[in-house]
Amino acid sequence: MVLVTSVRDYINRMLQDISGMKVLILDSETVSNVSIVYSQSELLQKEVFLVEMIDSISVSKESMSHLKAVYFIRPTSDNIQKLRYQLANPRFGEYHLFFSNLLKDTQIHILADSDEQEVVQQVQEYYADFVSGDPYHFTLNMASNHLYMIPAVVDPSGLQRFSDRVVDGIAAVFLALKRRPVIRYQRTSDTAKRIAHETAKLMYQHESALFDFRRTESSPLLLVIDRRDDPVTPLLNQWTYQAMVHELIGLQDNKVDLKSIGSLPKDQQVEVVLSSEQDAFFKSNMYENFGDIGMNIKRMVDDFQQVAKSNQNIQTVEDMARFVDNYPEYKKMQGNVSKHVTLVTEMSKLVEARKLMTVSQTEQDLACNGGQGAAYEAVTDLLNNESVSDIDRLRLVMLYALRYEKENPVQLMQLFNKLASRSPKYKPGLVQFLLKQAGVEKRTGDLFGNRDLLNIARNMARGLKGVENVYTQHQPLLFQTMESITRGRLRDVDYPFVGDHFQQGRPQEVVIFMVGGTTYEESRSVALQNATNSGVRFILGGTAVLNSKRFLKDLEEAQRISRSGSHMV
C-alpha cells in the first residue's frame, strides 16, 4: 500500500513499452505527478528527449514526425478539446494517449472522430490522479482549497467542481491500490459528507464493475474528515526537518525554491529536491527534530571533508582513475552537503530573527497545556514584542481564541484589539471568522484533550512525566483518530458509514482523506504510526499540503467570498 511505487510503475509501463525517441506531453497537474517520482535523467534513459506542456504543444506548428508523442494528462473537457485539435493537425509520428483517470464514453468518441489520419496507437487509463511525495502521503494540489469553507448556497458550481475533483482523486488512489473501501465521514462536515456519498455512488453504482476487486479478509476503510476539526496543527511553528522546511521556506512537490531566500548568492538561488526516495540523508532525518539535524549535518560535513581530502591526494595513474570513477558520486555528495547546510543555515537565521523559540514555546503551551491567565499574559507580551512578526502575532491570537473561546470574553476582545493595532495588515474579523468555521461548536474531536475523561487523564500523565522536547510536544488530532481506528473505537455516531456497507472489527488498511489539506506534522504521525506494526496501515491524503501561510491565505479567501456572498444571498 505504497502510492509512490504505484505511480512509478504506471510511468515505467508508459515509457518502456514504446520504443524509440519520445516526447512526453503533460498538463499542469500531471507534471507534478511525474516530476515527484521520476528524475530528468531517468526520463532520458527511457528515450524521452523532450517534455512539453499540452498548452504549448497546441501553439507550435513545427512537424516532428520522427518523435512518438506520449500524452499523460487528466481527462478534462479542456484537455480533450486541445487533443482533438492536435489530432486533427498531427505533428508527431505516433500518438500514445494515457489518461490519469476515468474517460467518459463521449470523450472516447470525440478522440476517435478526431483521429482521421489514424496516428493514435493506444488509449489507456493509468490511475495516477494524485501527487504522492512520500510513501504514505498524497495530495491533490488544489488551488481552490478555500472552497471547503464556503456554504454551498454562496458558490454551488464552485463547490461542485471542488467535490468532483476530490472524488476523482480518491477514486484514482483506490484504483491504483486495487481496493474498494467501506466509507465513513465526519458527521459535522457537510463537505466531507457530500464527498463521501459521491465517492460511494461512483464506486458502488456508476463504476461498480471497475471497483469489483478480489475480496480481502477485511475491507479497507476510507475516512473523509474536515480540516476544520483540527485548525491548531496548521497554525503551529514546526521543529522537525520536513515540516520545518515547508513552514519557513516552502516545499512544493518535494522541491524547495531557494530563490525565495533573498540573502543567498545568485549562483545558489536554485531549486533543490528534498525527496526521501532520492536523498538518503533526508530519508533518515526528515522526521528528526531541529537540534538533532544540526548534529547530523555536522557529521555529514565531516565525512565529506574526509572524502575531499583523499581526492586531493592524487599521486599515481591508479589514483587518478579512481578519482574519475568516483567523481559523479563525489559531485552528488558535494551537492547534497551544500543543500542541507544551506537549508539549515537559513532556517536558523529565521528562527533567530523572528524569535521563534520564544513564540513556539507559547504556541505549544496554548495547544497542549491549561492555564488561561498565564496564556493571556504570554500572548500579550509577544504582541508587544517588536521582534515578533505579523504572521506570528496573528497565529498566537488564533491559537489563544481557539483554546479559550468560552473563557473571559473581555480579555479575548482585548487581544483582538491589540492585534488590530499592532498588525493592521490583517483584515478585521479574521480570528472571529476562524472561530465561526472551526470553533468548539463546530468540532467533533477532542482537540485540546479537555472534553473526554480519558484524554484529560492522559494529558495529566504526560505533564507529570515531563516532555522530552517542549517544541514538539503537540500531537495532531489525527493521532487520536488513528488510535481510535486501531482499537476499533471510532464512534459510529461521530463518523457514520455511507449506505449499507458496514465494517465488522478493525480494518487492516485505512485511507484518511482530509478535506482542506494536510500538514507534514500529520504525515509524520502517519509514518510513525505505521512503524509501530499495529496491524493497521494508514495512508493520509488531502486537497493540499498546508503550512501556516497557506492555511491563513485560504481562510482570508474564504472570508472574502463569504462576505461578498452574504451580500448577494
UniProtKB/Swiss-Prot annotation:
Record key words, sorted: Auxin signaling pathway, Endosome, Golgi apparatus, Membrane, Protein transport, Transport
A Gene Ontology cellular-component term: trans-Golgi network
GO BP term, pick one:
auxin-activated signaling pathway
Presence of keyword Transport: yes
> Quick one: where is this thing mainly located?
Golgi
Give the source's domain of life in one word: Eukaryota
Which compartment or compartments is the protein found in? Answer: Golgi apparatus, trans-Golgi network membrane; Early endosome
| Phenotype of gene-disrupted mutants | Male gametophytic lethal and stunted growth associated with defects in vacuole formation leading to reduced cell expansion and autophagy-related defects in nutrient turnover. Blocked transport of vacuolar cargo proteins with C-terminal vacuolar sorting determinants.
Q: How does it sit in the membrane?
A: Peripheral membrane protein
Subunit field text: Interacts with both SYP41 or SYP42 and VTI12, but in different domains of the trans-Golgi network. Does not interact on the pervacuolar compartment with VTI11, SYP21 or SYP22, or on the cis-Golgi with SYP31. Interacts at the trans-Golgi network (TGN) with the SYP41/SYP61/VTI12 SNARE complex.
Output this protein's name.
Answer: Vacuolar protein sorting-associated protein 45 homolog
